[in-house]
Amino acid sequence: PLGIPTMKDRAMQALYLMALEPIAETTGDRFSYGFRKKRRTMDAIRQIDTVLNRQHSPEWILEGDIKGCFDHISHDWLLNHIPMDKTILRKWLKCGAVFNGKLFPTEEGTPQGGIISPTLANIALDGLQPLLAERFKRLWRNNKTFHYKVNLIRYADDFIITGRDKELLENEVKPIVIEFLKERGLTLSEEKTTITNIYDGFDFLGFNVRKFGKRLYTSPSKDAQKRFRAKIGDIVKGHKMCKQESLIRMLNPVITGWGNYYRYGASTDAFHGCDNHIYNLTKKWACLLYTSPSPRDY
């Protein structure tokens, strides 16, 4: 459930967050981008481009998926590692949630509706990047520099780890990640955690990232396009009898927001496809509203 704190608790959390956030920013992983000031999803995508769009870039990617990150973070770990008043933190973590007049206790996790929860989750997940950097640092072999090509890029609880080859990620990197998360009460989803070749592509933050030849391309993922088309369809089909200006007023923010998010990268084909979809939907809507001939007669 989405736990929403009371107004008093929200004010208290905001006060403690003012002191905790600078510490989290100072000690946080360098390439962590979620729930941090002056960082956004595009910064994470840009870092992926920096890492993978080079001549000798890594070609294998571990896509990590954490099972219910906010719901399963260990309270003991948070109480032992978060630099704030332990009594207050314990009360926030253990307060539970009230639904239909019944109290549901919380023995693990941090309420997703809490102002301070994203920072607590970030602190819990910070530390993996330096751990990997120390374990897989550059070596000098046979008068040559040997690179493991291990890089971590994280946005909140979504992350990818690059590697020199599939065996390195499967046999050495993945066990380290599993042990790191286990200490925090978290686990990787075996079904959703995959190792992919860059030429096959992978999805991250709504983008599909894939290499063709020597160039890296980012474009809206198929799932992102499907969700966008479904949302447009729901708006149009749910307002069959509204005025034209009302429908336009409802569609514009959705279209503009989606277009602005995906305007960077190779999005032309996706934009054309979605534009055609919107045209067909609104054309049918207009024909039904104004009792014109069937759309196929146009």
Name these PLM-found stretches.
Residues 30-31, 45-201:
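Conserved polymerase palm-domain catalytic core
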Residues 247-289:
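Non-catalytic, peripheral interaction segments enriched in hydrophobic/basic residues
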Residues 12-20, 120-121:
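Active/ligand-binding-proximal structured segments within catalytic/core domains
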Residues 94, 184-249, 254:
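A conserved non-catalytic segment of reverse transcriptases
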Residues 24-28, 60, 101-104, 155-156, ...:
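Short acidic (Asp/Glu) and glycine-rich catalytic loops that position anionic groups and cofactors
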